[in-house]
Amino acid sequence: MVLSINGTALPGVLYGETEIVDSQGHFLYMRHLSAPATLTWKSFKQGMLVCHQAFFARRDLVEPYDLQYRFSADFDWCIRIMKKADVLHNTHLTLIDYLNEGMTTRNHKASLKERFRIMSRHYGWASTVTHHLWFVLRLLYK
């Protein structure tokens, strides 16, 4: 992983893939959204492409979660960190095992509302509505 980092400055963010596991830690499947080759703060218009657990920010970029968000503070945090980072580096490695059922899954509706608010704040209302229409169409035609 370290050998794949180009340049002299350390990346602002290292990110990678996520395995979904059961409560016993057994592999179930790879997360349906895979880490993109190139990631920018605008990438999250497509959804949370990288789990925050597989997203490592350089210490000088880290800031607290915005606690007004109960279920999607990680989504907002990642966007804010990516906006500040000059270089985001895909490790091309599976970095974490993630439990199949988390807080966001159990509170799905509230989480979606929060994400809509977060996306509207970072990307604008019109862009957020457009992307959500695409999400709905994609679900209908799967």
Cite the ranges covered by each PLM segment.
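Conserved donor NDP-sugar-binding/catalytic core segment of glycosyltransferases
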Residues: 1-28
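Alpha-helical elements of Rossmann-like donor-binding domains used by nucleotide-donor carbohydrate transfer enzymes
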Residues: 1-4, 76-80, 114-118
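Generic structural signal for secondary-structure transition and capping sites
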Residues: 10, 86-87, 124
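Catalytic core of nucleotide-sugar-dependent glycosyltransferases
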Residues: 94, 105-130
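Conserved nucleotide-sugar donor-binding catalytic segment
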Residues: 16, 22, 29-110
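Charged phosphate-binding loop/patch that engages nucleotide di/tri-phosphates or the phosphate backbone
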Residues: 128, 132-142
